Structure formats: C-alpha cells, structure tokens
C-alpha cells in the first residue's frame, strides 16, 4: 500500500529546496498518486534554459517500488523516447531502493540529461545520431529545447491558440497534455 505520509513529506522537502535546485514536484490530484515533476535543463548542455515536465505515477508498492516517470515535455535524448517520453534509467527500474526519494530520482534524470548513455538507448534513432553525427544531435536537442521546453515559447504557443478563440486554461491544459506540441494541442482543442 502507498505510504502517503512519506509522499507528503517528500513534497514538503522538494518545496523547501526548490529555489536552490529548480526541481519541483506538485500533485496533479488530491490522492497524491499522480504528480508532476519539473526540472531545469542542465547548464552547458543542449537542454540549458529549458524547463522539463515529468509525469509521475505512484505505484501501490511505493516506496518499495519505483515511481513511474516519463517526460511530458518532448526531449531529444538517447535515453528518453522522443515519442512517448519513456525514460531508460536503472533507478526507475531494478536499481530502485526505498532509501531513494522523488527528488533523488528527478536529480538523477537531470544528471542523465548531462550524461547520455547512447550504448543503452531508449530511442535508437537518437542514439545513432548521437554516436554518428554529434553536432547534428546537439543542434536537434537545442531545437527541441527551444521549441518544447522554453517558457517564452510556451507563452507564444498559448497566445497563438488563445487568439484563435480558445480559452487560456483550456489551451494550457491541451498544450500540457500534448507534451508541448502545439499542433497536437490544436487538434485536441478542435475535437473537444
């Protein structure tokens, strides 16, 4: 059974330290089983200046089972699926320990952005590009960061969609649920 008191304590710890690390965790629901993590892109990487959101689902066995985490912000990285946001990181699988926390998992994901492991990829296409044409990889990763993870670009997307006649809250929700993809958000808004 989920230890909700531990999750609450971890959320409080993250809130206390968010200014220094930039890492945040917020509940998506009242029952604390769905959370959103936010990490800043590491300095000196193609992800610098970006803010990346991670969907977190707490399993019934937490803290003895790892939280399920995946990027909702699109990211170009060998160990992260460019399609689904799935993350290839050992501590989110067989190397999880109850001594680890949500914050340590998010710090580890942030470190993964700094140090890709292309020989153990989640996304083979990105890993191949990383190994065969590193400069193109860096350019693509920067472009994705600019397009999907920069706040200014988010505000520009919101503005464009609001100008089409959709409500601000509705637009922000559609963009978030689309991982920052403006075209997919527009499709969702039009089909709603």
Swiss-Prot record:
Name its pathway. Protein modification; protein ubiquitination
Where would I find the UBC core domain in this sequence?
Answer: 2-150
Q: Which residues form the UBA domain?
A: 153-192
Top-level EC class, please? transferase
Q: What induces it?
A: Up-regulated by syringolin, a cell death-inducing chemical.
The EC number(s) given in the record are 2.3.2.23
An example of a Pfam family matching this protein is: UBA
> Tell me, what does this protein do in biology?
Accepts the ubiquitin from the E1 complex and catalyzes its covalent attachment to other proteins.
Q: Of which family is this protein a member?
A: Belongs to the ubiquitin-conjugating enzyme family.
Q: What is this protein called?
A: Ubiquitin-conjugating enzyme E2 27
**Gene from which this protein is expressed:** UBC27
């Amino acid at each position: 059974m989920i230890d909700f008191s531990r999750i609450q304590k971890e959320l409080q710890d993250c809130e206390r330290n968010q200014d220094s690390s930039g890492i945040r965790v917020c509940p998506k629901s009242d029952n604390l089983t769905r959370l959103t993590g936010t990490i800043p892109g590491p300095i000196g990487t193609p992800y610098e200046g970006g803010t990346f959101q991670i969907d977190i689902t707490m399993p019934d066995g937490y803290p003895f089972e790892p939280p399920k985490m995946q990027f909702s912000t699109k990211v170009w990285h060998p160990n992260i699926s460019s399609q689904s946001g799935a993350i290839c990181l050992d501590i989110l699988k067989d190397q999880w320990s109850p001594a680890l926390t949500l914050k340590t998992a998010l710090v580890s994901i942030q470190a993964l952005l700094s140090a890709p492991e292309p020989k153990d990829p989640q996304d083979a296409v990105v890993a191949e590009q990383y190994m065969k044409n590193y400069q193109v990889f860096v350019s693509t990763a920067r472009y994705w960061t600019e397009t999907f993870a920069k706040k200014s670009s988010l505000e520009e997307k919101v503005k464009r969609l609001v100008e089409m006649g959709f409500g601000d809250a509705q637009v922000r929700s559609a963009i978030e649920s689309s991982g920052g993809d403006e075209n997919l958000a527009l499709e969702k808004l039009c089909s709603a």
